[in-house]
Amino acid sequence: MTARGGRAPLARRAVVYGAVGLAAIAGVAMWSGAGRHGGTGASGEPPDASAARGPAAAPPQAAVPASTSLPPSLAGSSAPRLPLDAGGHLAKARAVRDFFDYCLTAQSDLSAAGLDAFVMREIAAQLDGTVAQAEALDVWHRYRAYLDALAKLRDAGAVDKSDLGALQLALDQRASIAYRWLGDWSQPFFGAEQWRQRYDLARLKIAQDPALTDAQKAERLAALEQQMPADERAAQQRVDRQRAAIDQIAQLQKSGATPDAMRAQLTQTLGPEAAARVAQMQQDDASWQRRYADYAAQRAQIESAGLSPQDRDAQIAALRQRVFTKPGEAVRAASLDRGAGSAR
């Protein structure tokens, strides 16, 4: 995140959330955060890249009501719904990992034991008294073991992205660890993104092979693309359009285009509905920045009032809830607060 409210560049968010509506661009860049727990999915992807896609992804489901007592980092949010199969058992779907990754967002607020207790409560809130409750707890403990194993890797599993051999070894190692601890859950948790990582790595190997001419590289890349499943190929085409739209929005912002001019340009390439959503996002973004600045000023007054840490945190949490009333806003503000605290 960047300064001034810590927001991601509007160009990217406008496309991801407003214009094209895709999962964010996947690729080998995901390796830069390998092995981290907090703030990312377990694969080390950025938050906006951890959206499920591919055959292992479960369709979106409504969230369940938030627990009565949520950690500060999750205040105002609701846990994703745990999916069940026709027999009432926990469904082997990516949505289960999404639920656990949601819970892991709170690990900066909780001890290891506290995090386990929180996950148990969140599972019970949905599955209390069912066979799926014990199944979900078992998968949680296995997932924690997987994360702990990743954390024990050298440099937490991070590798030099320019070293394709190291990338290949890291991918194989992470897949092995996932299967060792998660067994048949490793496929719904990581199968789609592991496939994508291997595909992207194969593309890099071709592109960087000094023994190939440009024509040979193009031929091999085209052949590799033909091996891609139809749904992945369609997703890649959408990603390509997303990249082009991101570049266009960034150029318009850089040139100082007015909102009306930007909307007119985007209408030509993205269509009127998408252009209208980008314009609305600009307005929402400006409103957010004003409200966050006002909130930050009030938060600073609380921080300088000489309160005990417990009273200070309680007053700041209450302030967040008063100022940020829309779903997810309080969570976003808390995340920005933590980032600001780390920078100080």
Swiss-Prot record:
InterPro entries: Lipase_chaperone. Keywords: Cell inner membrane, Cell membrane, Chaperone, Lipid degradation, Lipid metabolism, Membrane, Transmembrane, Transmembrane helix. SUPFAM superfamilies: Lipase chaperone-like. It is found in: Cell inner membrane. The keyword Zinc does not apply. It is a single-pass membrane protein. Residues 43-78 have a biased composition (Low complexity). The chain crosses the membrane at residues 14-34. GO terms for cellular component: plasma membrane. Residues 37-78 are annotated as: Disordered. One of its GO terms (biological process) is lipid catabolic process. One of its GO terms (molecular function) is unfolded protein binding. The keyword Transmembrane applies. May be involved in the folding of the extracellular lipase during its passage through the periplasm. Belongs to the lipase chaperone family. This is Lipase chaperone. The gene is lifO.
